[in-house]
Each structure stands twice: as C-alpha cells, then as structure tokens.
Amino acid sequence: MNLEGIEDYGVKNIYSKIAPHFNSSRTYVWQWVKDIMKDIPKGSKICDIGCGNGRNMKFDGVNFYGLDNCEQFVDICKSQGLKVKLGDMCSIPFNSFSFDAVMSIASFHHLSNYPRRMTALYEMKRIIKPNGMIVLSVWSFNQPKKTRRVFSNYGDNIVTWDQYGKIYERYYYIFRITELKDMFNDIGLVIEKHFWDCGNEIFVLRKAEYYEK
C-alpha cells in the first residue's frame, strides 16, 4: 500500500465528500462515552480532537471545543452552534494546560505513520492540565460478529464507505495493544483504564506526573 499522501486522499478528501451522509447517519452517542461523561465534573473544559459532526460535544454542563481537519465537518458543527476549529491533531491550535480533558474518539487511527502518532499524543498531553485526562478510542482488530468490519491484518487497512451505491475507501491503522501501550509509555502517559466496547479499544490516560505527586 502506497502511504504517501494517504491522509489527504484516504481520510481528509474522503470525509469531505461523505460529510453530509456521515452527519445524517451518525447521530448516536455510544453508551461508553455517556458513562465516561458522567464522571467528568460539571464546568469542565473539554477538547474533542477529530470531532467530526460534533455528536459527542452535546453534553450539558461542560464546555466543549472541537478540532477537525475536514472543513465540511467544521461547517456542520458551527451550524449547530458548536465551538470548533479547523486544524490538524499534530498541531493543535490551543494553549498548553487549557483543558480538563481531551477526547479523541475514532480519529487517532487515521494517522498514517509513527512520528505523526507520537506528535498527536504529545499535543494532546500538552493541552491538558496537570490533573487532566485523555480519552482515546481506536478501532479494534477484534470486531463483533454482527459487524461488516473484518480485519485480516494489523497495521494499514482500507475500509469502504457506501454512499448511495458509490464506494469510498478510507484509510485506517489497526493497532496492536502492545503498540499503543508502548507509545503511551514513551510519551509519558499512564493507562488509568482500558476496555473493549463494540469493536473499539478505549483508553483513559493521565500524565505520568499525575501519579508521581
């Protein structure tokens, strides 16, 4: 698989074409997201990295800010009154120590190489407060039997999107758990919680120094 430029033509470009269809078909908020949000104090400031159509930014009592690299998604979010910026998760346009929590739900797996993945983790860590947390989810190799998503290998994958009979190919990277754990450790993030839900690997992360007090 030729990965040169794949984040542009296999992620950003594809989502720009399917954004309206995605928006109309992806309105449900996963139960595990709702459960995590119950534990986040009211008044918290949260950044949703790769926020898409903003479906996870509509909880009462918290201040959400979003980031996405797809202009069409940013426009959809703004039309709903959500505070969203256009940008890259490897260069997050927010100040250091700005947020109580960062959420990156089903977006980190679109990064195509190790340096960009580590840079994105560093950026997420940079913008959370010393006692802040990161909630990160990626698609799992282990998918439910009822799903049409079946992965034959870890690493680089193409997953199709059917928009009224027209097929679009999206890039995904399917991680080994050990691979993610090594990256978290190298960047100075501690896993507070890890669980699987509906084909997703979900991690709740804290800065290592949070545990060194």
Please place each PLM-identified region on the residue numbering.
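Class I (Rossmann-like) S-adenosyl-L-methionine-dependent methyltransferase catalytic domain
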Residues: 1-47, 52-91, 115, 119, ...
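A short acidic, Gly/Pro-enriched loop at the edge of an enzyme's catalytic core
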Residues: 90-102
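A short SAM/SAH-binding and catalytic strip from SAM-dependent methyltransferases
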Residues: 101-115
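Short alpha-helical functional segments enriched in proximate histidine and acidic residues
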Residues: 110, 127, 183
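A short glycine-rich, Lys/Arg-flanked "PGG" loop and its adjoining helix->strand segment in the class I
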Residues: 118-130
